[in-house]
């Protein structure tokens, strides 16, 4: 064989060895990369699963806390409303009681004023009637006196003087 052939064979072997080595290196790289990616995917899946569990737990806690807060707030509002209703009823009762007392006092005052007015009217009427009776009595006495004088004068003029 000629040295050129030997050399071509050696180069061919060298290229084949390099291709084989390159193939091995590529396979090893792909194998390592695949293993890394699978490990990374597994880790991401675990992280995602843990995140999902944590999110569910946090959501459940949040909803529970929110429900407790709302229940406490509703109870407080119910208590406040009950207290307001109670105070309103007491205030209304006090108002009605005070109003009834005021109206009773006004009615008593009006009754007193009406009695006083009636008494004054009765007294004034009695005084008026008494004064009128006195005046009429005085007029009647005067008219009687005048009539008596007229009769005497008439008698004297008819029969003469005695």
Curated annotation (Swiss-Prot):
PROSITE patterns recorded: GAS_VESICLE_C
First and last residues of every Sequence repeat: 19-51, 52-84, 85-117, 118-150
Single Gene Ontology BP annotation: gas vesicle organization
Domain of life according to the entry: Bacteria
Subcellular localization: Gas vesicle
Key words of the record: Gas vesicle, Repeat
Protein name from the UniProt record: Gas vesicle protein C
């Amino acid at each position: 064989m000629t040295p050129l052939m030997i050399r071509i064979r050696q180069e061919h072997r060298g290229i084949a060895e390099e291709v084989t080595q390159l193939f091995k290196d590529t396979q090893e790289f792909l194998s390592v990369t695949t293993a890394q990616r699978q490990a990374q995917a597994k880790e991401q899946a675990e992280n995602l699963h843990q995140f999902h569990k944590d999110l569910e737990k946090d959501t459940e806690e949040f909803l529970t806390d929110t429900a407790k807060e709302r229940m406490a707030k509703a109870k407080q509002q119910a208590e406040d409303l009950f207290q307001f209703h109670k105070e309103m009823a007491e205030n209304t009762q006090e108002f009605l009681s005070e109003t009834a007392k005021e109206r009773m006092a006004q009615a008593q005052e009006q009754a007193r004023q009406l009695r006083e007015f009636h008494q004054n009217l009765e007294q004034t009427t009695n005084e008026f009637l008494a004064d009128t009776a006195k005046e009429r009595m005085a007029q009647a006495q005067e008219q009687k006196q005048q009539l008596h004088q007229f009769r005497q004068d008439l008698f004297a003029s008819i029969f003469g003087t005695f």
